[in-house]
Swiss-Prot record:
GO cellular component: cytosol
Catalysed reaction equations from the record: XMP + L-glutamine + ATP + H2O = GMP + L-glutamate + AMP + diphosphate + 2 H(+)
Organism: Teredinibacter turnerae (strain ATCC 39867 / T7901)
Gene3D superfamilies documented for this protein: 3.30.300.10, 3.40.50.880, HUPs
Protein name listed in UniProt: GMP synthase [glutamine-hydrolyzing]
Gene Ontology MF terms in the entry: ATP binding; GMP synthase activity
GN (gene name): guaA
This enzyme's EC code(s): 6.3.5.2
Length: 525
C-alpha cells in the first residue's frame, strides 16, 4: 500500500459523553481515521500520536466544579485544529481565558441556532433563513452550563435566545467550539460541519475507505502471522464471517475455521455457513456437530444465566477439542471490534467509557496456547459490514439481524429441549421469510420468534388441540440501548400467525410482543 491510511488521523479526547463513539463514526464516514482516547492523555502521548486535528467531546461534568476534567495543554500548543463539543467547548473557553457558569435555562433536545459572522466551519451551511437573512441551523443540545465570556481572541459563531454563545472560533489558530452536538443525527448539517473541520480546515485526505481498509488489514495480517497457521471460531455471525473472508484472502490455506454446530442455530444455518465458506470460497472449515452434547448439558436447566454459562463453556470445550486435533497452529483469530475495545479500556480516572467484560476481549481461557490476531479491532460495526461487502460477502449475510451468542438457547424460555428448538426454528423461519416478502425485514432492527413453554387450547377442524405458544418480537432501534416495538401491519402479522399455526403441528397460538426497551429487554432471556 502506497499510503498509510492511519497517517491522516483525528484524535478524540473523551470526557465521558454518551455520544463520543458517534463522533468517531461521523469522522470515519467522512473518510478519515479517528480514535477515542481518555481526556487524561499526557502531553507527551498526544505529541507522539501526532494527530491532524483534535476533538474534545462532551461530558457529564461541570466545568465550574473544581476537580472537573480539563484538556491537556498540548491540545492548544500543537498547532493543529481543535473542535470542542459541548463540555469540550466549555473547557476550551475556560482554559484559554473565557468564563463558564451554570445556566438558569438548561437546554436538552432540539434547538435552532443562528449563525453569526463568517467562519470556515459553517461556510455555506444552513437549514433555514430568518427574516433578517441570517442562517439558522437545526441542532441537538444537551447542556446545563454555558460560556458567558469568550477568550479575548475568539469571535462569536452562533447563538440561541437562551445561550448567547452557542459557538465560537479563533480562526487564525483554527480553534472552534460548538455548544450543540453535530455528531447526533438530529443536528441536520452535522456531517457537513465535520467535513469542513476535517477535510477543509485540517486538510486531511479521505483515505479511510472500505477498499483501503481491506488492503491495509491484509498487509498487516500477512506481516504479523507470516507463514504460521491461524485458527478461527466461525459462528456465521457478521464479525466472524468478515474475519474469515479477510483472513482467507490474506493467508489462504494457512487459515482453518472451526464451526461449532450447537443445535441452537436458525433453520439450515449450519448448512448455509458450510456452503458459503467451504464450498463457495474454498475456506478450510471443520464442522463440529455437538447438538447432543449441548442439549444433554442443558437438560433440566431453567435459569437464563446458567444456560448462557453452560452454552459458553461447552462451546470452549468443543472448540478446544477440535483445536487440539490441528497441528502447529500458532494464532487464534477473533472478531473483536472497536466498541469492544473501548468498553474494556478505561482511563485510571474512570471518566472514560464504562468498563464491562465483553465476550471477545479478555474472556479467553488462561491456558490458551495461542497468540491473538484481531483484524477488525479498529472498526465499528457499520464499517465491518462495509468491508464485508468489499470482500464479496452477500448483502443478506452482512446485514442480517443480530443473533445472540447462546442462539435459540435464550429464545426458548426455561429448559431447552430438541422438540422446542425444532418448533422454534420453523416458526422463526416463517416469520423472517414473510418479513422479507413484505419488505419489512430491513425496516426492523431485529426480529425473531420466542418459544413459550406453556400450552394453550386451540381448535383445528372439529378437533380440540392443546399445544405450545409462540411469541413474535420485532423492534426498531438505532443503538440497541433503547428500542420500540415495530408497528408491523396487521395483515402481515395475520399471515405469519396463520402459517405458523397451520404449518407447525406443535403450535396452537401466536402472540405479538408489544413491549418497548426499557422497561423490557429486546431478548426475552
Amino acid at each position: 500500500m502506497t499510503q498509510n491510511i492511519h497517517s491522516q488521523r483525528v484524535l478524540i479526547l473523551d470526557f465521558g459523553s454518551q455520544y463520543t463513539q458517534l463522533i468517531a463514526r461521523r469522522i470515519r464516514e467522512v473518510g478519515v481515521f479517528s480514535e477515542i482516547r481518555a481526556f487524561d492523555m499526557t502531553d507527551e502521548e498526544i505529541r507522539e500520536y501526532n494527530p491532524k486535528a483534535i476533538i474534545l467531546s462532551g461530558g457529564p461534568e461541570s466545568v465550574t466544579a473544581g476537580a472537573s476534567p480539563r484538556a491537556p495543554e498540548a491540545v492548544f500548543e500543537l498547532g493543529v485544529p481543535v473542535l470542542g463539543i459541548c463540555y469540550g467547548m466549555q473547557t476550551m473557553a475556560e482554559q484559554l481565558g473565557g468564563r463558564v457558569q451554570s445556566s438558569e435555562v438548561r437546554e436538552f433536545g432540539y434547538a435552532q441556532v443562528r449563525v453569526a459572522g463568517e467562519s470556515a466551519l459553517f461556510r455555506d451551511i444552513k437549514d433555514h433563513v430568518d427574516s433578517d437573512g441570517g442562517a439558522l441551523l437545526d441542532v441537538w443540545m444537551s447542556h446545563g452550563d454555558k460560556v458567558i465570556a469568550m477568550p479575548d481572541t475568539f469571535s462569536l459563531l452562533a447563538s440561541t435566545p437562551s445561550c448567547p454563545i452557542a459557538g465560537m472560533s479563533w480562526e487564525e489558530k483554527r480553534f472552534y467550539g460548538v455548544q450543540f452536538h453535530p455528531e447526533v443525527t438530529h443536528t441536520l448539517q452535522g456531517k457537513r460541519i465535520f467535513e469542513h473541520f476535517v477535510l477543509e480546515i485540517a486538510g486531511c485526505e479521505p483515505l479511510w475507505t472500505p477498499a483501503n481498509i481491506v488492503e491495509d488489514a491484509i498487509e498487516r495480517v500477512r506481516e504479523k502471522v507470516g507463514s504460521d497457521k491461524v485458527l478461527l471460531g466461525l459462528s456465521g455471525g457478521v464479525d466472524s464471517s468478515v474475519v474469515a473472508a479477510l483472513l482467507h484472502r490474506a493467508i489462504g490455506d494457512q487459515l482453518t475455521c472451526v464451526f461449532v454446530d450447537n443445535g441452537l442455530l436458525r433453520k439450515q444455518e449450519g448448512d448455509q455457513v458450510m456452503d458459503m465458506f467451504a464450498k463457495n470460497m474454498g475456506v478450510k472449515v471443520v464442522r463440529a456437530d455437538a447438538e447432543d452434547l449441548f442439549l444433554s448439558k442443558l437438560h433440566g436447566i431453567n435459569d437464563p444465566e446458567q444456560k448462557r454459562k453452560i452454552i459458553g463453556n461447552t462451546f470452549i470445550e468443543v472448540f478446544d477439542t477440535e483445536a487440539a486435533k490441528l497441528q502447529n497452529v500458532k494464532w487464534l483469530a477473533q472478531g473483536t471490534i472497536y466498541p469492544d475495545v473501548i468498553e474494556s479500556a478505561a482511563s485510571k480516572t474512570g471518566k472514560a467509557h464504562v468498563i464491562k467484560s465483553h465476550h471477545n476481549v479478555g474472556g479467553l481461557p488462561e491456558d490458551m496456547q495461542f497468540e491473538l490476531v484481531e483484524p477488525l479491532r479498529e472498526l465499528f460495526k457499520d464499517e465491518v459490514r462495509k468491508i464485508g461487502l468489499e470482500l464479496g460477502l452477500p448483502y443478506d449475510m452482512v446485514y442480517r439481524h443480530p443473533f445472540p451468542g447462546p442462539g435459540l438457547g435464550v429464545r426458548i424460555l426455561g429448559e431447552v429441549k430438541k422438540e422446542y428448538a425444532d418448533i422454534l426454528r420453523e416458526a422463526d423461519a416463517i416469520f423472517i421469510e414473510e418479513l422479507r416478502n413484505a419488505d419489512w425485514y430491513h425496516k426492523t432492527s431485529q426480529a425473531f420468534a420466542v418459544f413459550l413453554p406453556v400450552k394453550s387450547v386451540g381448535v383445528v377442524g372439529d378437533a380440540r388441540r392443546y399445544e405450545w405458544v409462540i411469541s413474535l418480537r420485532a423492534v426498531e432501534t438505532v443503538d440497541f440501548m433503547t428500542a420500540r416495538w415495530a408497528h408491523l401491519p396487521y395483515d402481515l402479522l395475520e399471515k405469519v400467525s396463520n402459517r405458523i399455526i397451520n404449518e407447525i403441528s406443535g403450535v396452537s397460538r401466536v402472540a405479538y410482543d408489544v413491549s418497548s426497551k426499557p422497561p423490557a429487554t429486546i431478548e426475552w432471556e
